[in-house]
């Protein structure tokens, strides 16, 4: 995956959602087509992807860890950090609001196009998830993958491997 040019993919990102005063779900805002070229061109970014929003490892460790380490990554020359998941923008936005995410930006890869382009789309049908992204992180410099951190495949002994793509591991590899 390293040295792979990210193809031009368009995501439908929902912007303008605000948390409602009555505690209900935020449903306002507009869909804005956003391309990988807009997100990654001319910048050094981290994209990490995971099987699903609101899932245990993703919600307890991975997304909160990248959010907490945001300034450390910025100090090492990273311009932005993105989380991608094969979920729609409503789910992604609700997840970020639920976790209080302010710095990590969301990529709703609802059709799995980014995951597929990177060879990371996997079949999670055995647990009724359908097609989802494997857990990974990449450092992208001006649209090209510089470094890749891909978790090993799940096994009976370790059904949700996590460590290779952790924020701590990614951070220590950036010079």
What is the meaning of each model-derived region?
Residues 1-175:
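Chalcogenol-based redox active-site neighborhoods
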